[in-house]
């Protein structure tokens, strides 16, 4: 048994990990403030945590990891902080381009990319295209960039309405399955587990459609300090729950 599998065993897991885990990467700013550092240092530390957790998820058999990198509301932050976040994303993508194909990691973006700087938008599109041909069985990381759950649903509704107006669809054709194909997450299963570090206990406009039956796990650990052991705890907590999807326990 590999070292990774030994870790899983000692974590007390009852079964395989969730197929899809989503994380609200929260607490970067507070982590930096506690250490007397600029908020940008917290985002840099948080980016390294993402790398580590993504690799760990891939190694333990998680198929999809979706992370909240930048919300539609984050534009309200200072120009310095927004620029630092975008620079980190650019740095990560430039480095990832050279390794994703080799490591069989697919990268996909959720969100409205229109307001994103052209250079970063083109880079995101390039990385998406580079990994598009990889097997559907390979690990996939979804990065939510300029993303908001309400905005995602609204964009999908507008697309459906436009097709109805053009006579391509009829309103009565629409059901949950069809509507989901208009979302950023089209073709991707809903997350079984949503994790939020930092002690906050709210969704913050994250995956509002997809979270209908997700389990939620909250921890006071700030995102830069979130490690493999913390993820093990979250998965163990998830596996201890009775998921009934609106039914009753048998």
Residue ranges and their predicted role:
Residues 1-250:
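Flexible, compositionally biased loop and terminal segments
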């Amino acid at each position: 048994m590999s070292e990774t599998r030994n870790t899983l065993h000692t974590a007390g897991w009852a079964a395989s990990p969730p197929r899809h885990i989503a994380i609200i990467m929260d607490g970067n700013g507070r982590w930096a403030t506690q250490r007397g550092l600029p908020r940008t240092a917290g985002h840099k530390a948080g980016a390294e945590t993402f790398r580590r957790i993504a690799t760990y998820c891939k190694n333990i058999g998680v198929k999809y990891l979706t992370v909240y990198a930048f919300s539609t509301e984050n534009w309200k932050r200072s120009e310095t902080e927004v620029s630092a976040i975008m620079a980190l994303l650019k740095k990560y993508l430039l480095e990832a381009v050279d390794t994703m194909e080799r490591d069989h990691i697919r990268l996909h973006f959720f969100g409205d990319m229109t307001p994103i700087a052209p250079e970063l938008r083109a880079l995101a599109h390039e990385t998406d295209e580079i990994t598009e041909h990889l097997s559907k069985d390979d690990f996939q990381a979804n990065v939510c960039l300029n993303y908001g759950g309400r905005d995602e649903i609204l964009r999908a509704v507008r697309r459906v309405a436009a097709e109805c107006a053009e006579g391509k669809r009829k309103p009565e054709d629409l059901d949950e399955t069809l509507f989901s194909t208009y979302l950023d997450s089209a073709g991707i299963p809903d997350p079984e587990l949503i994790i939020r570090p930092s002690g906050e206990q709210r969704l913050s406009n994250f995956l509002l459609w997809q979270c209908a039956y997700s389990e939620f796990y909250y921890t006071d650990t700030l995102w830069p300090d979130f490690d493999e052991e913390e993820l093990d705890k979250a998965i163990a907590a998830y596996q201890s729950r009775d998921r009934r999807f609106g039914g009753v326990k048998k």
